[in-house]
Design a protein with these regions (language model features):
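Extracellular beta-propeller repeat domains
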Residues: 2-399
Length: 399
């Protein structure tokens, strides 16, 4: 059960350590676009951002809002924030932990980790341009899935696709992949957990031009350390790669969304693994690539300060093939570091673009990043702001 008193480390269960293999860069500057406040404001942002055609940013927070059950917020280009919707609890959702999907009509779609029914298994919701919320589906936590922790994908027909972290087979409750029709009917496309299949999908889905879906699971696979998978139009699943940290260099526990290039290569991060001599011998995590044939390459392994530790939210890809992401901890503060924003180039060279201090600039970024046309990066930090009132920040990193 998520509560506001839980520490960021408990939320991710990340083994922290010092980091020393990166190339620090301090030419980039951070701007705090907004600091969340106590009271009825949104609080504790745990996910990334989406933007509309005029540059407004939208996101979710785990807590805050009128009922302290989480909120959806809008931040305009002038830095003015507005709570678009406050979750009520009960039949409504509680604690949205994923980023939103914004359609051309200005409707926002997302998930909550809790609420919806007595099962407390979460919901899929829609918020229209006026701020009116509609619960599209309430999970039961049974065969349909439960506790969705990831963002949604929407097709041209208005169907929504996503992952549920739990539910599915009664013997495992290892999660599902689901589809929600515009009318709110749910179809389970795949149930995780049998044999060497993946288990516990934390990240969302991406699609190719043939409507194949790709994603990751935190556990399961041939070695119990997570998988990269593909689901075709018929619902048939293929395990593209099973992580094997036992080989001493591979990653473990992929927990974020994937990125895909024009050649069909998939890129992502693992929460642990890589250099087994770091982070209490669990490894501080990796950035990886999986080619269309299922061959994996570790592009970068996080080590000791100041490169960060625990990259949990995946990466975004620019036109030059550079990858950008966040680490939830590490940096110059060592085991108690407040996280970093990083870049990995096509040759596997990592650059720390920014390291958080945990003060007014924010700390513990769990989010995936949003990149604009000129290379500015936008994201959220789970904590930070004035000590008395700060409940996390929205930030911009300028290249």
């Amino acid at each position: 059960m998520l509560t506001k008193s839980l520490s960021p480390r408990f939320l991710l269960s990340v083994a922290l350590a010092l980091c020393a293999l990166a190339v620090p860069s301090f030419g980039q500057t951070e701007t705090v676009l907004y600091t969340f406040q106590a009271g009825t404001d949104a609080a504790l942002p745990y996910a990334g951002l989406v933007h509309d055609s005029i540059g407004n940013l939208y996101g979710t927070t785990l807590w805050g809002g009128t009922y302290n059950n989480g909120a959806v917020f809008k931040l305009d280009r002038g830095g003015h924030e507005r709570v678009v919707y406050s979750f009520v609890g009960g039949n409504d959702g509680i604690a949205p932990a994923a980023s939103l999907f914004l359609d051309k009509g200005g409707n926002l779609y997302g998930t909550t980790t809790r609420g919806g029914s007595s099962a407390d298994a979460g919901i899929v919701f829609k918020i229209d341009a006026t701020g009116k919320e509609t619960v599209l589906y309430r999970f039961t936590g049974g065969s349909d899935g439960g506790k969705p922790l990831a963002s949604l994908l929407r097709d041209r027909s208005g169907n929504l696709y996503g992952t549920a972290y739990s539910g599915g087979y009664a013997s495992c409750l290892c999660g599902t992949i689901f589809k929600i029709s515009p009318a709110g009917a749910e179809t389970v496309l795949h149930t995780f957990g049998l044999g060497a299949d993946g288990q516990f999908p934390l990240g969302g889905l991406i699609a190719d031009s043939s409507a194949n879906l790709y994603g990751t699971t935190k556990g399961g696979g041939a070695y119990g350390a997570g998988t990269v998978f593909k689901i075709d139009r018929t619902g048939s699943e293929t395990e593209l790669y099973s992580f094997n940290p036992g080989n001493g260099t591979d990653g473990s526990q992929p927990s974020g969304n994937l990125a895909r290039d024009a050649a069909g290569n998939l890129y992502g991060t693992t929460l642990e693994g890589g250099d087994q001599n770091t982070c209490l011998n669990f490894g501080c995590g990796t950035v990886f690539k999986v080619d269309p044939s299922g061959n994996e390459t570790v592009l970068y392994a996080f080590g000791d300060q100041p490169d960060g530790a625990g990259p949990s939210s995946g990466v975004v890809l620019d036109h030059a093939g550079n990858l950008y992401g966040t680490t939830y901890s590490g940096g110059p503060g060592g085991p108690d570091g407040f996280g970093t924003v990083f870049k990995v180039d096509p040759l596997g060279q990592e650059t720390v673009l920014y390291h958080f201090s945990g003060a007014l600039d924010g700390g513990f970024p769990h989010c995936s990043l949003l990149i604009d046309r000129v290379g500015n990066l936008y994201g959220t930090a789970f904590s930070g702001g004035p000590p008395e009132t700060g409940e996390g920040v929205v930030f911009k990193i300028k290249p």
